[in-house]
A protein has these predicted regions:
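A structural supersecondary motif
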Residues: 697, 707-716
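Positively charged n-region of N-terminal signal peptides that target proteins for export
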Residues: 1-8
């Protein structure tokens, strides 16, 4: 609602209150193409979304179900103008499929409405089919190195931008690159020792930095956050934490992306034994939900809109969707209440039936035969990137199992061991043993031949949708914009730009064996990634056009988890900042204690236990900045290997009988009575903060991470909210974490430095928090701040630096 109010106020400033209309843009040349490209497909005689038709003057003036689309002379009252100003993440944004209107198009529509919305007599709008995607040539040669591949990328992008009206900025300096790459690759700002090490390197220190960051233990944590958003991982649902741990371990061991996805789609069993099954459990093993999620997440295609009818915005038919859903049609989610287990298995009955239940009687519906509705790319001869991929997989297979070198591509995909040559993780070894146990008891956790087939079809290197969808997401994560937006909407009607750059990166991704680190290395070493942002004096339309064409860096705010960890890093909050006992305080709390009396309660009623009361939320936001820390190794450790046998031996009838007996038990029980007491304890106020990368996810709605954009991950097509809010400002200004990060602890290096050289301490603070030295003006101001009390002054300076935009935004 606040967004809409702001838009209405903005529109009101440019609207004319009188009936004297301004000069109008030309309808045929300026307005008609915008409406036909972006609106008529969903608002015509056959499709009247929201009750609105926009193909004739009469119909558009009649408005829709809820408001007037156009009020001549009054943009603020015109619902169409309001909705095209909304952000892509806002409900009701128009157009809700394809690209958003650019500022020039919005200005033209606004001027047209201000001028009275003139419409030539007899003109009827028709849907304008998308123009063919423009491409430039891609070199056929194999890049000699990642640096060479990055140079090819830059050249392709330059040629694609030759006719664009955009400004190209220079590349950033070394320290800015250090900060940007460290934030993007390992999810926090660089530390002072890391800055010094980087500056001491000779030669191409940027390449050395990239190699170091890609090998850093935090790389897996940072990119697990990326994958958790993409896969909608939720700790609160069955298998959520196990899936999160599986993704983390897969990235840590450099498991190829296609192998990971195969495991996610085909997994069966229990999450504790086969953590990849969390993807299937995440959608309750529902074939319809899984079909929509699989296509949208892994292929970037929103075929889910064809679940109930032919796709209203694309060419997919409802039968296409049902054919895809049939691959999941025999998958079952089984729950055993007595054993406390939930698992997936494969049944014998197809649950996906055609025609849909609202279009036929039950006896008329037939099981659907699975069909993959996406076509692979066909080549007259095997292209270079596929030849490289096949050769790489053959080498991997020979290294892991001693292959003959004559296997087919499918055999190479099935046999490759992504962990060949790597040190074995004992936890994963145990998990693999547990997985082999599942095969012994295959009658319980039956594998899915249908889903295994689907996994192979989706990850086939000739299926261009698969690689392009992932590359588009990674590119947007690193650069700020995707080649297609929304990121999961590859469609003939979507605005795909810089298609040749996307093609090149996708092919290199396939050729690398779907290696995430190789993809990121190419991007980070490119000049495109190193571009500086445009200055504030550049007109908005020029800046937005340049950012969209990847010739200037957009302003990107840190992810919530990255901002959290950067505050922890800047403030030395991962370790104690004071000696033990240096900050003792008294804290009161309420606990439940026994009274010595007994009371009678009904059978089955919960028995009170001695426990502390749930903590109140503090005004300083402390409880909104902490959360449950996850131990991924513990989550992946198999437990109770004998559980399968116990499940087999207990008949369903026996389990049900026990459950019914427990439910019917109603005899009264004698239990202890408890009362609430307030107690006061002395605590050492010397807090440490864990990394946000391994918190249970998503965080509660009021948590720091959610306030700074972490999505709920409840539905498809949900992306991070990068907009700013007053709540964010208050949490940074008044939050406990910012306060603790600002305080100067006696165990911090800067504490001793303050005693010796205040000017040097100021330089240290700037480099530690902003990864740069202060200007002379900033140094003068800081010295004045430290003049009365150096330690309090330094705390104030650090607090100010943590709250500035320069800290929160990626340079």
């Amino acid at each position: 609602m606040p967004t809409k109010i702001f838009i209405l106020q903005t529109l009101a400033l440019v609207a004319t209150a009188s009936t004297v209309f301004a000069a109008s843009p030309d309808f045929v040349d300026d307005i008609q193409p915008i409406l036909e490209r972006n609106c008529v497909r969903c608002h015509n005689a056959e499709k009247t979304k929201g009750g609105l038709r926009m193909d004739t003057y009469k119909s558009i003036m009649q408005g829709g179900d809820t408001a007037d689309a156009i009020v001549p002379g009054n943009p603020a009252a015109s619902e169409l103008l309001v909705r095209i100003h909304l952000r892509p993440i806002d409900e009701g944004v128009m157009p809700d499929e394809g690209r958003a209107l650019d500022p020039k198009e919005i200005a033209l529509l606004n001027d047209w409405v201000k001028a009275g919305a003139p419409w030539p007599e007899g003109v009827t709008l028709t849907e304008q089919k998308p123009e063919p995607v423009k491409r430039v040539s891609i070199p056929a040669r194999t890049p000699e190195s990642a640096t060479d591949a990055a140079a090819i990328l830059d050249d392709i992008l330059r040629r694609e931008n030759e006719e664009s009206e955009s400004m190209t900025t220079g590349t950033v300096d070394d320290l800015v690159f250090l900060r940007r790459a460290t934030i993007d690759l390992i999810g926090r700002i660089p530390t002072t020792p890391e800055i010094r090490e980087f500056e001491a390197w000779s030669g191409d220190r940027r390449e050395k930095l990239v190699d170091k960051l890609l090998a850093h233990p935090r790389f897996a944590d940072r990119w697990t956050i990326f994958m958790a958003d993409m896969l909608r991982i939720r700790s609160s649902i069955e298998g959520g934490n196990q899936l999160l741990a599986f993704i983390n371990s897969s990235i840590a061991e450099a498991k190829p992306y296609d192998i990971m996805v195969r495991e996610l789609i085909a997994a069966s069993g229990r999450a504790n034994s086969n953590p990849a099954v969390g993807f299937i459990l995440g959608d309750d093993a529902n074939p319809m939900e899984l079909a929509a999620a699989t296509a949208q997440v892994f292929l970037g295609v929103r075929i889910g809109c064809a679940m109930c009818h032919d796709h209203p915005f694309d060419d997919w038919e409802q039968r296409d969707f049902y054919d895809l859903a049939a691959f999941f049609g025999k998958t079952q989610k089984v729950g055993n209440q007595r054993m406390g287990t939930v698992y997936t298995t494969e049944g014998s009955k197809m649950t996906v039936l055609w025609p849909p239940e609202d279009k036929a009687k039950p006896e008329e519906r037939e099981p659907v035969s699975p069909r993959f509705p996406f076509k692979n790319t066909k080549y007259d001869s095997t292209p270079n990137y596929l030849t490289r991929f096949e050769k790489l997989r053959e080498q991997q297979q020979q290294k892991s199992i001693g292959g003959s070198g004559t296997e087919s591509l499918d055999a190479l995909l099935d046999a490759v061991n992504p962990s060949a040559g790597k040190k074995a993780d004992p936890v994963l070894v145990e998990a693999e043993k547990e997985s082999r146990l599942l095969n012994v008891h295959g009658d319980i956790y039956r594998t899915s031949e249908l889903r295994e087939k689907l996994a192979g079809l989706i990850t086939n290197p000739r299926n261009d949708f698969f690689a392009r969808a992932y590359v588009n997401r990674v590119w947007a994560e690193m650069i700020g914009h995707g080649f297609v937006e929304p990121l999961d909407n590859f469609s003939p009607y979507a605005d795909l730009h810089h298609a040749s750059t996307l093609d090149f990166l996708s092919r290199e991704f396939v050729a690398s064996g779907y290696d995430l680190r190789s993809l990121i290395r190419i991007i980070v070493l490119s000049d495109t990634y190193r571009r500086a942002p445009l200055t504030a004096d550049i007109p908005l339309t020029v800046r937005e056009n340049s950012e969209r064409n990847f010739t200037a860096a957009p302003q990107r705010r840190m992810l919530g988890e990255v901002l959290y960890d950067s505050i922890v890093t800047a403030g030395h909050l991962k370790d104690f900042k004071w000696p033990a006992g240096a900050n003792m305080k008294e804290v009161s709390s309420e606990i439940r204690v026994p009274t010595g009396e007994y009371i009678m309660v009904e059978g089955g009623a919960p028995t009170p236990e001695m426990q502390t009361e749930k903590p109140m939320v503090r005004n300083d936001g402390y409880d909104l900045e902490s959360s449950l820390k996850l131990d991924f190794n513990s989550i992946l450790t198999p437990k109770e290997a004998s559980e399968l046998e116990r499940m087999r031996k207990e008949s369903d009838e026996h389990i049900k009988a026990l459950e019914m007996a427990a439910a019917q038990k109603d005899e009264k029980q004698k239990v202890m009575k408890y009362t609430t007491k307030t107690v006061t304890n002395k605590v050492d106020d010397n807090p440490r903060f864990d990394s946000a990368m391994r918190m249970a996810t998503p965080a509660p709605p009021a948590h720091f991470l959610r306030v700074f954009g972490q999505p709920e991950r409840a539905g498809l097509g949900e992306f991070r909210d990068s907009s700013s809010s007053l709540r964010q400002q208050l949490m940074m200004l008044n939050g406990r974490m910012t306060h603790e990060a600002s305080r100067v602890g006696s165990l911090e290096p800067i504490h001793q430095l303050l005693e010796k050289d205040e000017a040097e301490a100021i330089v240290y603070a700037y480099r530690e928090i902003l990864t740069r030295p202060p200007t002379e003006e900033e140094k003068t101001f800081a010295l004045a701040l430290l003049s009365e009390d150096p330690h309090e002054g330094m705390a104030d300076l650090r607090w100010a630096l943590l709250n500035c935009n320069e800290f929160r935004f990626i340079p």
